[in-house]
């Protein structure tokens, strides 16, 4: 059971598993352009999904994955949240992570529905991490049971480095 603020929450859709192909998406960047999974073809991808960039755990998650993984060869870290692109851009500037790739699902929540991350009760994304190989096959996934907890950084980082 997944909880948020100590209460059970529900989702629509089926959780993705290791071995599944990642689903395509159309998300909004901080400059209001659109990005899809295809825009990162040929690269290893870490999808770091957070409820809101302006919370402590989400900020820590975004910073840690960017600091530890963005320098890996042929690897991109994509942070996805429901935050407006303006808030994501402001956060990057304030945190000195100007090169972080921030993607917003605010427009139609399709990423959240497709990846079974849209919290029905809150219209926020649940916390999760997906590590994809260059063919967009999921090699590691964690749907965090307690959204107010950090993901398993060590396992996700090890999975990304092993690709």
Curated annotation (Swiss-Prot):
Disulfide bonds join 58-92. The active site is at 58 (cysteine sulfenic acid (-soh) intermediate). Keywords: Antioxidant, Disulfide bond, Oxidoreductase, Peroxidase, Redox-active center. It catalyses: a hydroperoxide + [thioredoxin]-dithiol = an alcohol + [thioredoxin]-disulfide + H2O. It holds the Pfam family Redoxin. GO terms for molecular function: thioredoxin peroxidase activity. Residues 16-162 form the Thioredoxin domain. Its EC number is 1.11.1.24. Belongs to the peroxiredoxin family. Tpx subfamily. The active site is a conserved redox-active cysteine residue, the peroxidatic cysteine (C(P)), which makes the nucleophilic attack on the peroxide substrate. The peroxide oxidizes the C(P)-SH to cysteine sulfenic acid (C(P)-SOH), which then reacts with another cysteine residue, the resolving cysteine (C(R)), to form a disulfide bridge. The disulfide is subsequently reduced by an appropriate electron donor to complete the catalytic cycle. In this atypical 2-Cys peroxiredoxin, C(R) is present in the same subunit to form an intramolecular disulfide. Thiol-specific peroxidase that catalyzes the reduction of hydrogen peroxide and organic hydroperoxides to water and alcohols, respectively. Plays a role in cell protection against oxidative stress by detoxifying peroxides. Homodimer. HAMAP family: Tpx (MF_00269). This is Thiol peroxidase.
């Amino acid at each position: 059971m997944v909880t948020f603020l100590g209460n059970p929450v529900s989702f629509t859709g089926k959780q993705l598993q290791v071995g599944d192909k990642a689903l395509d998406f159309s998300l909004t960047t901080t400059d209001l352009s659109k990005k899809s999974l295809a825009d990162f073809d040929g690269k290893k991808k870490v999808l770091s999904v957070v409820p809101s960039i302006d919370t402590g755990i989400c900020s820590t998650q975004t910073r840690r994955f960017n600091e530890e993984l963005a320098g890996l060869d042929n690897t991109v870290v994509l942070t996805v949240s429901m935050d407006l692109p303006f808030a994501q851009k402001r956060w990057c500037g304030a945190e000195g992570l100007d090169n972080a790739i921030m993607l917003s699902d605010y427009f139609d929540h399709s990423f959240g529905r497709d990846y079974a991350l849209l919290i029905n009760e809150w219209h926020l994304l649940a916390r999760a991490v997906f590590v994809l190989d260059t063919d967009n096959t999921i090699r590691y996934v964690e749907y965090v049971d307690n959204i107010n907890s950090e993901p398993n950084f060590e396992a996700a980082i090890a999975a990304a480095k092993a690709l």
